[in-house]
């Protein structure tokens, strides 16, 4: 596993952000804290095998076993009971986080059909970025022949940045393709 993005962060991105935002200390420079990959499988209410396949796909993508998420409330219209398994999520930190980000930016996002860049409006006001992916087959680890259903996922990139501008410049330096 290469930590090329970690090396890039330490050698190129930190000095550039220090000069751009006039930080007093290198420790003030925003950094990636974690990446959360969440896959909601609403159909798991009626067919629990779908959840197993989602867990398997997330394990392939991230190299880490996902946590199964459960419903917080019962909703009768969706035939959903409290405590029922309805999704899976993985929290990536450290080298696995940098490896996943590198794979996302350089391999997966360019494989999206009609891709013109990701929205720059998906920041939450505290320096975190949320990205929705409509199909899991953009990742090279997923074998298209073995996919029984195209599922989307949410990718949340949590940074230590105080503002959205700092977080955007951090992600831009990592090569995130924002829309112009």
UniProtKB/Swiss-Prot annotation:
Cystine residue pairs: none
Q: Name one GO cellular component term.
A: ribosome
Q: Which PROSITE patterns match?
A: RIBOSOMAL_L5
According to its UniProt entry, the protein's GO biological process terms are: translation
What is the role of the protein in this entry? This is one of the proteins that bind and probably mediate the attachment of the 5S RNA into the large ribosomal subunit, where it forms part of the central protuberance. In the 70S ribosome it contacts protein S13 of the 30S subunit (bridge B1b), connecting the 2 subunits; this bridge is implicated in subunit movement. Contacts the P site tRNA; the 5S rRNA and some of its associated proteins might help stabilize positioning of ribosome-bound tRNAs.
Q: How does it assemble?
A: Part of the 50S ribosomal subunit; part of the 5S rRNA/L5/L18/L25 subcomplex. Contacts the 5S rRNA and the P site tRNA. Forms a bridge to the 30S subunit in the 70S ribosome.
Record's protein name: Large ribosomal subunit protein uL5
Question: What gene does this protein come from?
Answer: rplE
């Amino acid at each position: 596993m290469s930590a090329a993005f970690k090396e890039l962060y330490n050698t190129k991105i930190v000095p550039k952000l220090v000069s751009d935002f006039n930080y007093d200390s290198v420790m003030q420079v925003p950094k990636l804290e974690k990446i959360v990959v969440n896959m909601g499988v609403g159909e798991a209410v009626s067919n629990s095998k779908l959840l197993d396949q989602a867990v398997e796909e997330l394990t392939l993508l991230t190299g880490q076993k996902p946590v199964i998420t459960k419903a917080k409330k019962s909703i009768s219209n969706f035939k959903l009971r409290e405590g029922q398994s309805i999704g899976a999520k993985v929290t990536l930190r450290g080298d696995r986080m940098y490896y996943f980000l590198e794979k996302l930016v350089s391999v997966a996002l360019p494989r999206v059909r009609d891709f013109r860049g990701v929205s720059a409006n998906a920041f939450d006001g505290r320096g975190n970025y949320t990205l929705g992916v409509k199909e899991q087959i953009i990742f090279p680890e997923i074998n298209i022949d073995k996919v029984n259903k195209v599922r989307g996922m949410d990718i949340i990139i949590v940074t230590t940045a105080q503002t959205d501008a700092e977080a955007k410049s951090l992600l831009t330096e990592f090569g995130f393709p924002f829309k112009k």
